[in-house]
Amino acid sequence: MRAVVQRVTNARVTVSGRTVGQITRPGLVVLVGVTHTDTVRQAHALAVKVHELRILRGELSCAQTGAPILVVSQFTLYGDTRKGRRPSWDAAAPAATAEPLIEAFVAELRRRGAEVATGVFGADMLVELANDGPVTLVLDVD
């Protein structure tokens, strides 16, 4: 699994003009991609890493502060641009594989006590955020 984690002051996701998920105070936006070989174990490991990642102000984590997390599925994180000018999406898992793993990631965050908002899996979403810092990290879990 791959995640792009951004420290934000606020963020929201809209689908067809309707807000489906938002955080209104400082926290994290996590864009999550899934590849073919990913497992529930990896989803849980990524959730632990994100929840305990000390990138909030004061070198604190969401686990320590209760800061909210907005999770957005994003298959394009596995886009391959090594050949030509049109990305290949072959490394991205199909929806039937990816959606349950995104759900497992979110469920593990919530099980750990995180306040989690989400986008809509597979939807055409508009993600608005105020990146704080900016602080942006790419996490890969094998």
UniProtKB/Swiss-Prot annotation:
Entry's localization field: Cytoplasm
Name a GO CC annotation attached to this entry: cytoplasm
Isomerase as a keyword of this entry, yes or no, is no
Any one biological process term the GO annotation gives: D-amino acid catabolic process
Alphabetically sorted, this entry's keywords are: Cytoplasm, Hydrolase, RNA-binding, tRNA-binding
Cite the EC number.
Answer: 3.1.1.96
- A single MF term (Gene Ontology): Gly-tRNA(Ala) deacylase activity
Gene3D superfamilies linked to this entry: D-tyrosyl-tRNA(Tyr) deacylase (3.50.80.10)
The main place the protein resides is cytoplasm
**Entries under InterPro entries matching the protein:** Daa-tRNA_deacyls_DTD, DTD-like_sf
> Annotated motif Gly-cisPro motif, important for rejection of L-amino acids: location in the chain?
133-134
Q: Which reaction does it catalyse?
A: glycyl-tRNA(Ala) + H2O = tRNA(Ala) + glycine + H(+); a D-aminoacyl-tRNA + H2O = a tRNA + a D-alpha-amino acid + H(+)
Broad EC category: hydrolase
Could you tell me what this protein does?
A: An aminoacyl-tRNA editing enzyme that deacylates mischarged D-aminoacyl-tRNAs. Also deacylates mischarged glycyl-tRNA(Ala), protecting cells against glycine mischarging by AlaRS. Acts via tRNA-based rather than protein-based catalysis; rejects L-amino acids rather than detecting D-amino acids in the active site. By recycling D-aminoacyl-tRNA to D-amino acids and free tRNA molecules, this enzyme counteracts the toxicity associated with the formation of D-aminoacyl-tRNA entities in vivo and helps enforce protein L-homochirality.
- What family does the database annotate? Belongs to the DTD family.
What is said about its interaction partners and assembly?
A: Homodimer.
The record comments on the domains as follows: A Gly-cisPro motif from one monomer fits into the active site of the other monomer to allow specific chiral rejection of L-amino acids.
Q: What is this protein called?
A: D-aminoacyl-tRNA deacylase
**In which organism is this protein found?**
Acidothermus cellulolyticus (strain ATCC 43068 / DSM 8971 / 11B)
